[in-house]
Amino acid sequence: MARARAGALLALWVLGAAAHPQCLDFRPPFRPTQPLRLCAQYSDFGCCDEGRDAELTRRFWALASRVDAAEWAACAGYARDLLCQECSPYAAHLYDAEDPFTPLRTVPGLCQDYCLDMWHKCRGLFRHLSTDQELWALEGNLARFCRYLSLDDTDYCFPYLLVNKNLNSNLGHVVADAKGCLQLCLEEVANGLRNPVAMVHARDGTHRFFVAEQVGLVWAYLPDRSRLGKPFLNISRVVLTSPWEGDERGFLGIAFHPSFQHNRRLYVYYSVGIRSSEWIRISEFRVSEDDENAVDHSSERIILEVKEPASNHNGGQLLFGDDGYLYIFTGDGGMAGDPFGTFGNAQNKSALLGKVLRIDVDRKERGLPYGIPPDNPFVGDPAAQPEVYALGVRNMWRCSFDRGDPSSGTGRGRLFCGDVGQNKFEEVDVVERGGNYGWRAREGFECYDRSLCANTSLNDLLPIFAYPHTVGKSVTGGYVYRGCEYPNLNGLYIFGDFMSGRLMSLQENPGTGQWQYSEICMGHGQTCEFPGLINNYYPYIISFGEDEAGELYFMSTGEPSATAPRGVVYKIIDASRRAPPGKCQIQPAQVKIRSRLIPFVPKEKFIPKTRSTPRPTARAPTRAPRRGRPTAAPPAPTPRPARPTQQPGSRRGGGRRRGRLNSASRAFRDGEVRLVRPAGLSSGSGRVEVFVGGRWGTVCDDSWNISGAAVVCRQLGFAYAVRAVKRAEFGQGGSLPILLDDVRCAGWERNLLECQHNGVGTHNCEHDEDAGVVCSHQNPDL
């Protein structure tokens, strides 16, 4: 397991600004399965399927029946525009649905020019489009009417959002930050677990999932994420482990038989003490005849036991392949450098340690409690154990079979493993029948034992990817995403590192066979601001898992001890695009419940974005692959902590400014503001700068709206805030630090420091997002 405690292709993701597409159901937009008729402009990507488009079409023609022909001829286009904004990928913004403190609009937010034009030509249409009587009452006052229909965040008003490059250039793609880090989100699924080492499903149509704790308990969860109060399996009395952090012994793996629905058999992998020695044991259990959510503990049948010469490198993965055989992944026996025998256990075909084993649990032969698949690569070799499928393994921690592309089946059956390294490198391998993965001759791409490495008969397969210990020190293998809910992630191999807490990904280029590395970070700004989503996780990434539908999860903990209930299961979410409604519906088979249910209560919270403390960067060395195997190395990734940590903003001095403001003329108070503007603008317009802690700095425009502008304008002696300005419209304050970000004001505050914000100096933006205001002594509605 992991060590002791120390913290297609690129077309699918693009660099971009922090736009926030969201539908009225508070979920990401999608690509409809059929073209839309009324709202055809949203056929490629939006918030309506064919059913909703048909309903809007009915409303459109019902509206036509209530308007005379001449008016309809002039106004039909406006009617279509307004009705179809429910289908916009930014519908939640257009209708103020993303703000729980404001009522949902009945008419989308309009840009001033469009509203003025429509008011002059078709204002009578609004009485048929909206039941809002406040809007009706303003119909005779053009300025107040259009003010009422405006948005605080003018970036999202219709129709300007259609041509806003920042909102449209990355639409529907996973956005990567400036360093190429893919921005994803998480959903908490289970918590309070003691080192959750595995999450599996039974392939029986119930869509239950089972989470194993290192201490020796397995819990059953229903599709609604409630947990059964009675453990599915409890062998904690015989499992060998301890409370000390980093103990690699314990309950390590579980796999359900492919025909579990009919034979009720499952298999477990755990550490056990036998006559003062340490062993790994693979056993078969059967589910109770009386309770399908509980194992019959008396049914244990020991399949295989292997003596461990040390307490670490115990392996622990069990998998069934499409061939129906059970794959067992053992470690090399522990200690440093695989010191056992002339070549170590991993290179010794007569040893079961340091191997991938493959057995047939459905038959027995040669006096064994299992059979040997006839095509195992070393059957008939007197110097080899017939169970051996692959060798040269140090300590593969978490492996998975690729389900294959949902449409073409491409990739199905590939076996991915993360193999934990010694002193320098971690690696990801694709395991093949008879393959030699190099340990202890090689660690990653580099030689470890130079005499073995020079042996021409080694014929080892290099990893598809390796990274140095400046990036992470204990790889946790993951899965190729093949689920239904997030199409952009299809084909992406997602894995992590236990020690550094880094999430990572690999994507194969089908044309070249090369693997492209991308780090995964938690979404910035509003990326993860959807109900139920979070943007942080505990740093010790223990394992990954799939549910029955193919959605992807990982397990991590804040305290890597087998007795500490700090473990959490997270679902990986792409907030940029989802599958069309109805496509991914499941109908779980019924399960009889005989114990109490414990409802799931999430504990983790969304953390507003912050600037992360940078970690060391590194590049893994590469070598020319053998036998045509593709290689990849991380392009100097900058790690990010799992939980964002606050860092003070830059202290680059602002000094005195040329022009209108002289900051040295008097003492300033914290929270005081000033406007800096290009020549020719009125005194009420400019970039907002705020004084805090003896220095001036700028305000980032994330969450910046008219309420924040009102606070600034009132401080400066203006009666009215006309506009909240974004995107450094009044120039960039590049010589100053960014002091405030995600400022959320109600409008009554005395200064910006009294508004909600991320903390002084805590931000994740650049000066091209400097906020500004337009203030006035005159009421803009008159």
UniProtKB/Swiss-Prot annotation:
Superkingdom in the source lineage: Eukaryota
InterPro entries: 6-blade_b-propeller_TolB-like, Folate_rcpt-like, Glc/Sorbosone_DH, Quinoprot_gluc/sorb_DH_b-prop, SRCR, SRCR-like_dom_sf
GO CC list: extracellular region; membrane
Biased composition (Pro residues): 632-642
Disulfide bonds: C181-C521, C185-C528, C399-C417, C484-C584, C700-C765, C713-C775, C745-C755
UniProt keyword annotations, A-Z: Disulfide bond, Glycoprotein, Secreted, Signal
Biased composition (Low complexity): 610-623
Cited Pfam families: Folate_rec, GSDH, SRCR
Glycan-carrying positions: N234
One Gene Ontology term from the biological process aspect of the record: artery development
Residue stretches making up the SRCR domain: 673-776
Subcellular location: Secreted
Stored SUPFAM superfamilies: Soluble quinoprotein glucose dehydrogenase, SRCR-like
Annotated stretches, region: Disordered: 604-666
Signal peptide: 1-19
Record family assignment: Belongs to the HHIP family.
Descriptive protein name: HHIP-like protein 1
Organism the protein comes from: Homo sapiens
Gene: HHIPL1
